[in-house]
Design a protein with these regions (language model features):
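Positively charged, low-complexity intrinsically disordered leader regions
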Residues: 1-56, 60, 128
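Glycine-rich phosphate/diphosphate-binding loop of Rossmann-like nucleotide-binding domains
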Residues: 48-60, 144-219
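Short, structured coil segments at secondary-structure junctions
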Residues: 65, 115-116, 172, 197, ...
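Adenosine-phosphate binding glycine-rich loop
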Residues: 254-255, 260-305
Length: 305
């Protein structure tokens, strides 16, 4: 669906997603070609949850487009408590050209997008992390040359990152396998939606079987923000799901390692893998800015800026 918003990758068509990657690649190669779409304009960046890479990369993306990023902490506005999400969106839309938000509940973004007369972008929610996925597929394309038919294996919690990877895979022709322990699988609704878009998305509980012949092996933390009370339980549940040298050897010498960060060495990934020669994690992190810039340009153009 073509929309002046990006809440999840299924807001894009396959052609739009490919165009996003092409734009990110072109501007990365030639920063002088970046249009100043936000010249003299502000971008409201709302963060209910703490952020490192997302905040820095998005702020720099706004600056790269000629704009002024306005960082707003969740406690400053009290979304849903002191003020409703629609009221916040309407207010910031009166003096900002775009709103981007990192929220606890995906419904907050839906409410903002429905109310705001300017584009709204998801910087992370409990359901999706689309800007991360754009950077991920940009990185995979740089590493492999093409995306169609590539095998991406995600090992770990079937969380928001895995969900956005499923939609990205469907839009690009990448074959995605998600290996998770029982009770932590990617939601079947997401799997069904991705398959309805033409995606090849498979679920398994065996990370080694999943990894065979992979072009890239991806993992994320076992315990996400807000799940700290489950840390001990999750360490037990995810035993055997560490991406280590043995698992990468099963994948094959062609396989790259990806991680959205922050990483916990000795838990979801071994130090030898993340710091090894087949790790593309730092390229992936650097691509967050290029991805954010392309996404912002896309929604701004659709929004008539």
């Amino acid at each position: 669906m073509t929309s002046a918003r990006l809440l999840e990758l299924d807001d894009l068509t396959p052609a739009e997603f490919t165009a996003l990657l092409d734009t990110a690649t072109a501007w990365k190669a030639d920063p002088s070609s970046i249009p100043q779409l936000l010249a003299g304009k502000g971008a409201a960046l709302i963060f209910e949850k703490p952020s490192s890479r997302t905040r820095a990369s998005t702020e720099m993306a706004v600056v790269g487009l000629g704009g002024h990023p306005i960082y707003i902490r969740g406690e400053e506005i009290g979304l849903g408590v002191r003020e409703t999400a629609p009221d916040v969106a309407r207010t910031y839309a009166s003096f900002c050209a775009v709103i981007a938000a990192r929220v606890f509940d995906h419904s907050t973004l839906e409410e903002m997008a429905a109310a705001a007369p300017v584009p709204v972008v998801n910087l992370l929610s409990d359901q999706a992390h689309p800007l991360q996925a754009v950077a991920d597929f940009l990185t995979l394309r740089e590493l492999c040359g093409t995306l169609e038919g590539r095998r991406l294996v995600y090992v770990g919690d079937g969380n928001n990152v895995a969900a956005s990877l499923a939609f990205g895979a469907a839009l690009t022709g990448v074959e995605l396998t998600v290996a998770s322990p029982q009770g932590y699988e990617l939601d079947e609704t997401i799997v069904r939606q991705a398959r309805n878009l033409g995606g090849v998305v498979e679920l398994t509980s065996d990370p080694h079987e999943a990894a065979r012949g992979a072009d890239a092996v991806y993992t994320d933390v076992w315990t996400s923000m807000g799940q700290e009370e489950e840390t001990a339980l999750r360490k037990v549940a995810f035993e055997g799901y560490t991406v280590d040298e043995d698992l990468m050897a099963t994948a094959g010498e062609q396989a790259w390692f990806l991680h959205c960060l922050p990483a916990h060495r000795g838990e979801e990934v071994s130090a030898r893998v993340i710091d090894g020669p087949r790790s593309a994690v730092w390229r992936q992190a650097a691509n967050r800015m290029d991805a954010a810039r392309a996404v912002l340009a896309h929604v701004l153009t659709l929004g008539g800026v």
